[in-house]
Amino acid sequence: MAKIDFRNKINWRRRFRSPPRVETERDILRIFESDRGRIVNSPAIRRLQQKTQVFPLERNAAVRTRLTHSLEVQQVGRYIAKEVLSRLKEQKLLEEYGLEELTGPFESVVEMACLMHDIGNPPFGHFGEAAINDWFRQRLAPGDALGQPLTDDRCEVQALRLHEGETALNALRRKVRQDLCSFEGNAQGIRLVHTLMRMNLTWAQVGCILKYTRPAWWFEATPASHSYLMKKPGYYLAEEEYVARLRKELDLAPYNRFPLTWIMEAADDISYCVADLEDAVEKRIFSAEQLYQHLYDAWGNHEKGSLFSQVVENAWEKSRANYLRQSAEDQFFMYLRVNTLNKLVPYAARRFIDNLPAIFTGDFNHALLEDDSDCSQLLELYKNVAMKQVFSHPDVEQLELQGYRVISGLLDIYQPLLKLSLEDFSELVAQERVRRLPIASRLYQKLSTRHRLAYVEAVNKLVRTAPEFALMEYYYRCRLIQDYISGMTDLYAWDEYRRLMAVE
């Protein structure tokens, strides 16, 4: 078992322009303060204010956006981190674990990972993800590339079809097709901070947002030892080299996770479960009283002194008593949130410490709040009621379907860029406008400069005479379109779709 020493994990160095040396705790803290500034001031964080949490295109400012949700996750993450450090201090383990001079960076890395955890999410959340993946699957048919070359391969792109006698190229084609059909918000977050935004964060800070460890091109069965850690794609083929370097810098074995990521994940789980229910009441999907009844019915066996009675019933009774002379609804959620935090945060901290050897190594194959405990049952209660009563509500489903159509429609609109030959697209990139390509020229002009530069840099690194050049150029071209559309806010995507479809 590896010795637990967080000085080997909280790596303050950066990919570029790393400080040559640090001598004091203050020097290290200053480096992580720089990370905080880069993150808080980034456009990706600002865009979260117009991205969906649960209710797309919501005009009621009291209902959460991705930004307000992320701020709440940040606070809960800070709370859990402080609880962990406090308990380790009580057990006189801070020095032994190399944390005595790293308590500030420990908290900061968790907080900023919490703030950033959703930056890669596309417009309309999971329905935006589904739209991107479905659109590319219909055109690239990754399932047809899993075996030997097929005469009836449904892939529409000639460069990506498998060919007899091209074993190495076929392996790459297989990876590319799978990768492009596995868009995921967490993987896009890694791409944003490194490739697109060039934030040059510390290795520890980036490691903390690598939530899932499965490569997006993975098409085999996941190993049982990492079934949870690899349940979703965590990074793309485009960032393979960067993530390999990240693992080396953080001393992580393949498919293992950075230790502090478990805290970020627990903070997200705690935050959104209560918040989604509160937003549903704010939207008048049901009343606070109806919500309490839903929770009561779904809990099942009610015993005196149960966690349900300590958290939910206690909040309900206090809100009825109206000690603070405020609206009973507001009081109910205040008490529900406080009671939930006061139970789940210490439990998450205890689970973190109890499983620290596996968590430090990075192969603890569970979430902190997913076990057979009452705390896990309470969290599952909130999730199940939200799924049954909120996400299945006709108003929510209608907006989600509209979001799916908007993203699919935008991909249709920008498809001419993907249908251009390598020669024509290269000419368009070089000249920015080509008279014989009027539609493609106008579409290309609309793409973000940041995304175009990322494409150009990636293609310039390729060897033009190499057999895989055409294949990888097309891969980065698809990434360009995915980067642009996934980076839109909900409102921008909605307005852009309406404008380009000539609805207004």
From Swiss-Prot:
Top-level taxonomy: Bacteria, Pseudomonadati, Pseudomonadota, Gammaproteobacteria, Enterobacterales
InterPro entries, A to Z: dGTP_triP_hydro_central_sf, dGTPase, dGTPase-like, dNTPase_1, HD/PDEase_dom, HD_domain, PHydrolase_assoc_dom
Function of the protein: dGTPase preferentially hydrolyzes dGTP over the other canonical NTPs.
Organism name: Klebsiella pneumoniae (strain 342)
Enzyme nomenclature, EC number: 3.1.5.1
Subunit structure, as described in the record: Homotetramer.
Catalytic activity: dGTP + H2O = 2'-deoxyguanosine + triphosphate + H(+)
Gene expressing this chain: dgt
Name of the molecule in the record: Deoxyguanosinetriphosphate triphosphohydrolase
Alphabetical keyword list: Hydrolase, Magnesium
Family indicated by similarity: Belongs to the dGTPase family. Type 1 subfamily.
GO biological process: dGTP catabolic process
GO molecular function, one term: magnesium ion binding
Alphabetical list of PROSITE patterns matching this protein: HD
Broad EC category: hydrolase
Cofactor annotation: Mg(2+)
Every HD domain range: 66-273
Superkingdom, taxonomy of origin: Bacteria
